[in-house]
């Protein structure tokens, strides 16, 4: 009984990871891609995406769920890059400049995001999601109407022909892969962007260190139980705001790293999918709404992007249509988020029901404590 | 005076601002060369087009399931009904009603499974509904490509299979409701009688339903689940009913929208249609746990009025198209306002 239960807990906890490994393994042979190509792609994408995904960790520790509001940081980073291109600052200096511009904006946006989320406790995720849309409207307004009219843009080649507003696609030639190419390690036919990985490693060290600080401990306490933390004298609302600000700033830096690797910026929709991909990645890596680790991030990015690499070609081969592969990967991305959230909510309710049953004592016995009856009780008892 | 104050508080500042903004737009319209009669006609038309999808929000809000971000399931059921009706070559009123009848079983099945899922995740419905909706749309994208439809007006010409992204309903049931008993005044104003009657019929049925025994029980579940359970109401069953009704109304809503708009839009088209419906009912004064017919009426008129008037008036005023930005800010700002407000109310 107990062993079976353990096994079922294991499966329900790692269900998403297991499903993902299986789908990807099945899709590799029909895609016709060599293992070496897939590995190189994964290395590139680890460098490109890990930083963004790591930005999700702190809000999870603080009990605020998956921070869909990270898109705010991504927009701040894009504004920074637009100015870097405008002033013609190239190479890694351009990236640093973009970060310096993005930093105050992302701190401000993070603060706003924290305030809004404090007013919507228990609904942080959906609120963050909508807030990202809302700020997107302001971003569009700023980039499309303010830049070039209210704020003068020196570089006319990035401005729309009507005289104000930024062009739909911005060529980031001047800063393209400038972080990756500082030291490009070539080992056994693979190219590894060393500096990018060092930056990511430093962030990991920061996260580990931060968790041990007073603030980090407070954050975990708030994440466990807000009422208890409040009673223990921790400023709950402030701690939550700090968590979101750090996350937003990291997302700003992450988006700059992401875009320098991509090499061009879709001015008006590059940030649309940022939150979606980052959240999907961390969930694929086995994280949940309340638990996440650095390992989840790297496992998740690897698995998610392995599937993204193979699925269009596999779709082409299996169904004769690349579009099917494309739709399939989006279906899986959204589906993974949905399944993880469902499993998490379901587990929480089950745990609560079991706790209630154990309180009720001996006459019910442990026999009723597992599986379906307990779930039903959540609604009925 | 106190009455007035509480009224303002209940109604909420954002709505009042939007209302006056809309009035200002209407006042400005003639001065910038926008015809008022044509504008009114547009607003009425778009109100009818969208009202049923907004109405679909009501049952789930009432039963405590929150805003139905998973309305896409209903929309997809409607798309299935519409495409099947075209596939069966149903024309005219028969085609339109046929689409609704054909969509009904799908909406009930989707709604039932959707409700089962939502009952397992009480408290987290909104985020989950959103992602269930998205992933279902993506799943259906694959289905639209491989389902064996073969009506030449619907499939890609060169491949002979796979549905087109937009399908015209011109030869089938274009504007079948809009033109029913339509009253034409002058050159630019058309009163879409049939469309509005149809909307009124559904709103009336919903109003009746909310006052029936089941409807009252459903509202009780939304107001206080523990109390409802103590008085012998089956909470999960009531929630299931509300989700199925909501999904069904979503299906009817998109078919009504299509007959007026003229095209069936497939693939990823349903996903951007959900948020406007959510925003509209919130602009109308609903909160995430209370909604009424008045909210639907006021909200749809205000929101669609805004969508109709901002492009024409603001564009002629500023010589630039800011309507998209205004739409994004207003609709999402409204949802955000509702999400952050409930705490204050429950205190």
Predicted regions and their residues:
Chain A
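Membrane-interfacial amphipathic/re-entrant helices at transmembrane-helix boundaries
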Residues: 1-54, 91-93
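Cytosolic-side transmembrane-helix boundaries in multi-pass membrane proteins
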Residues: 1-24, 224-231, 235-238, 300, ...
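Single transmembrane alpha-helix segments in multi-pass membrane proteins
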Residues: 24, 36-87, 111, 116-122, ...
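Central hydrophobic cores of alpha-helical transmembrane segments
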Residues: 73-77, 128-134, 294-307
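Alpha-helical transmembrane segments within multi-pass membrane transporters and channels
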Residues: 90-136, 304
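Transmembrane helix-bundle core of multi-pass membrane transporters
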Residues: 135-211, 320-325
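Helix-loop-helix "hairpin" substructures at the membrane interface of multi-pass membrane proteins
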Residues: 188-266
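Transmembrane alpha-helical segments in multi-pass inner-membrane proteins
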Residues: 251, 255, 259-330
């Amino acid at each position: 009984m107990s062993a079976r239960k353990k096994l079922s807990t294991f499966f329900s906890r790692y269900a998403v990871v297991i499903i993902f490994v299986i789908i990807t393994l099945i899709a590799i042979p029909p895609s016709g891609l060599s293992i070496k190509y897939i590995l190189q792609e994964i290395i590139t994408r680890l460098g490109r995406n890990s930083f963004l995904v790591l930005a999700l960790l702190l809000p999870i520790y603080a009990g605020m769920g998956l921070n869909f509001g990270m898109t705010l940081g991504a927009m701040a980073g894009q504004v920074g890059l637009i100015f870097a291109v405008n002033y013609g600052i190239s190479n890694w200096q351009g990236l640093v400049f973009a970060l310096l511009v993005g930093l105050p904006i992302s701190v401000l946006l993070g603060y706003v995001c924290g305030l809004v989320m404090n007013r919507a406790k228990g609904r942080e995720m959906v609120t963050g999601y909508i807030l990202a849309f809302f700020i997107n409207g302001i971003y569009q307004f700023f980039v499309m109407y303010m830049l070039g009219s209210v704020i003068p843009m020196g570089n006319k080649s990035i401005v729309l022909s009507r005289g104000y507003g930024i062009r739909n696609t911005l060529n980031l030639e001047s800063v393209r892969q400038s972080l990756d190419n500082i030291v490009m390690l070539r080992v056994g036919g693979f190219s590894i962007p060393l500096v990018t990985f060092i930056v990511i490693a430093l962030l990991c060290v920061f996260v580990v260190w931060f968790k041990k600080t007073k603030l980090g401990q407070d954050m975990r306490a708030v994440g466990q139980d807000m009422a208890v933390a409040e009673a223990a004298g921790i400023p709950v609302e402030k701690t939550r705001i700090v968590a979101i600000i750090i996350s937003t700033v990291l997302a700003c830096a992450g988006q700059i790293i992401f875009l320098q690797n991509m090499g061009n910026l879709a001015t008006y929709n590059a940030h649309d999918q940022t939150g979606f991909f980052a959240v999907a990645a961390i969930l694929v890596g086995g994280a949940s709404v309340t638990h996440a680790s650095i390992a989840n991030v790297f496992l998740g990015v690897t698995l998610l992007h392995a599937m993204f690499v193979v699925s269009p070609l596999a779709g082409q081969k299996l169904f004769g249509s690349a579009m099917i592969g494309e739709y399939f990967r989006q279906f899986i991305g959204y589906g993974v988020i949905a399944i993880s959230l469902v499993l998490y909510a379901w587990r929480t309710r089950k745990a609560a029901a079991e706790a209630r049953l154990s309180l009720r004592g001996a006459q019910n016995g442990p026999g009723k404590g597992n599986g379906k009856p307990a779930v039903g009780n959540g609604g009925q008892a | 005076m106190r009455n007035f104050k509480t009224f303002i508080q209940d109604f909420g500042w954002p709505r009042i601002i939007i209302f006056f903004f809309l009035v200002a737009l209407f006042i400005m319209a003639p001065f910038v060369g926008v015809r008022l009669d044509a504008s009114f006609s547009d607003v009425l038309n778009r109100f009818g087009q969208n009202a049923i999808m907004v109405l679909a929000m009501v049952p789930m809000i009432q039963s405590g399931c929150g805003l139905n971000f998973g309305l896409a399931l209903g929309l997809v059921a409607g798309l299935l009904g519409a495409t099947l009706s075209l596939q069966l070559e149903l024309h005219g009123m028969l085609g339109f009603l046929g689409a609704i009848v054909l969509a009904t079983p799908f909406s009930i099945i989707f709604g039932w499974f959707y409700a089962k899922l939502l009952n397992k995740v009480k408290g987290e419905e909104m985020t989950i509904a959103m992602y269930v909706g998205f992933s279902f749309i993506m799943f259906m994208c694959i289905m639209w490509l491989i389902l064996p439809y073969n009506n030449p007006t619907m499939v890609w010409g060169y491949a002979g299979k796979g549905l087109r992204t937009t399908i015209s309903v011109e030869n089938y049931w274009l504007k079948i409701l809009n033109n029913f008993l339509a009253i034409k005044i002058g050159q630019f104003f058309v009163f879409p009688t049939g469309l509005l009657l149809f909307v009124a019929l559904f709103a009336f049925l919903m109003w009746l339903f909310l006052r029936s025994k089941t409807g009252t029980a459903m509202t009780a579940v939304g107001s206080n689940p523990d109390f409802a359970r103590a008085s012998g109401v089956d909470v999960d069953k009531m929630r299931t009913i509300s989700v199925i009704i909501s999904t069904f109304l979503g299906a009817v809503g998109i078919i009504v929208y299509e007959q007026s708009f003229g095209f069936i839009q497939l693939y990823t088209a349903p996903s951007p249609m959900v948020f406007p419906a959510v925003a509209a009912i919130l602009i109308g004064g609903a909160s995430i746990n209370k909604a009424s017919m008045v909210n639907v009426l006021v909200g749809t008129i205000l929101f669609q009025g805004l969508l109709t008037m901002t492009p024409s008036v603001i564009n002629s005023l500023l010589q630039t198209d800011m309507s998209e930005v205004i739409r994004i800010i207003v609709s999402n700002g409204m949802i955000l306002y509702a999400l952050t407000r409930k705490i204050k109310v429950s205190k």
